[in-house]
Amino acid sequence: MIDLYYWPTPNGHKVTMFLEEAGLDYTLKPVNIGKGDQFKPDFLAIAPNNRMPAIVDHAPAGSGAPISLFESGAILLYLAEKTGRFIARDVAGRAEVLQWLFWQMGSAPFLGGGFGHFYAYAPEKLAYTIDRYAMETKRQLDVLDRRLAESAFVAGADYTIADMAIWPWYGQLAQGALYGAGDFLAVQDYRNLQR
């Protein structure tokens, strides 16, 4: 059994996607970030970076003591290795999956903490800041659009943890469901993200 420390954000959705698609048993442990639950000592013992998601796997492969993990990319990789699912087994395919997983982990802060914050949540709307992060977000959407023009999924022919990491951020954005920014970012122009 896996305990999933979760709140319904794009990063939280990544891990629930894996758990649901793999059919793994888990218990949802809400971490209400609006009320500051991420700063409580019990949660910090599992996720010292005070960010969710985090998991505790009470039945790790090979048995042994429970394993606690934080950071969505690390969790996805752990679950893929534990189950043998949603990651290529050959070296080249695995490298491709990890490349796109790490691309998302490095790029999403510009989308969420940058564009999303200043466009949707900042108390003062600063045009320069919004435009700067919008330009970077559109560059990232273009990277994905070009990749999906040549590949069924971001890491090749198969659905992987890279897709699970990317969709909650970029898929929702491309559908106009994140930050209400679809028209502003002209997401309809990224045809391969619309499929």
Could you describe each region identified by the protein language model?
Residues 1-138, 145, 152:
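GST-like domain detector, emphasizing the conserved glutathione-binding G-site
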Residues 74, 96-99, 163-164, 168, ...:
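Amphipathic alpha-helical interaction segments
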Residues 80, 102, 149, 166-174:
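Amphipathic alpha-helical core segments of compact helical bundles
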Residues 107, 111-116, 154-191:
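GST superfamily/GST-like fold recognition
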Residues 132-136, 184-195:
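Extended, well-ordered alpha-helical scaffold segments
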